[in-house]
Design a protein with these regions (language model features):
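Substrate-recognition "cap/lid" segment bordering the active-site pocket of phosphatases
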Residues: 108, 114-146
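N-terminal helical cap/lid subdomain that shapes the substrate entry/recognition surface
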Residues: 2-11, 15-94, 98-103, 116
Length: 146
């Protein structure tokens, strides 16, 4: 039997129970700018790159007016504002990760999300000492499922 050397935790919806906050951030952004989402932001978009989600849920006119990069970055800022007061690891994960670390098992975050969100989660959940490595969507050429 081979020894487990490491655990990689997906961040959004696994390491932290934050998915409703992403949906709320899209809704809040639309409210602030006075437009409607083309379709609801639901599970089908989880794991997508932020720019791809913007293109999927907003009309092309909105994307052209504001710019996809601006909209994506702004949405992530709103998400962090909304989630900060409630940010915490999924119940039971902190002791599991602490046990893994005590056994010499490395732990990492792997996320399609932007680096700013990964850093935010590590800071807001006080989990820097738990993670040996963090990988974000900024660190890879192609996001999931590649």
């Amino acid at each position: 039997m081979s020894k487990i050397k490491g655990l990689i935790f997906d961040m959004d919806g696994t390491l932290v129970p934050n998915m409703p906050y992403h949906s709320r951030a899209f809704e809040e952004q639309a409210r602030r700018h006075g437009y409607k989402l083309r379709r609801p932001v639901d599970g089908r978009f989880f794991g997508w790159h932020k720019d791809d989600v913007i293109r999927a849920v907003l009309d092309s006119e909105i994307c052209e007016k504001y710019g996809v990069e601006f909209l994506a970055d702004e949405k992530e800022e709103i998400y962090r504002e909304l989630y900060r007061p409630d940010a915490d690891l999924t119940p039971g994960l902190r002791p599991l990760i602490q046990e893994a670390k005590s056994l010499g098992i490395g732990c990492a975050i792997g996320s399609a999300g932007p680096r700013e969100n990964v850093e935010f989660i590590v800071e807001a959940t006080n989990s820097a000492e738990l993670m040996d490595v963090t990988i974000s969507g900024n660190d890879v050429q192609h996001c999931k499922p590649n």
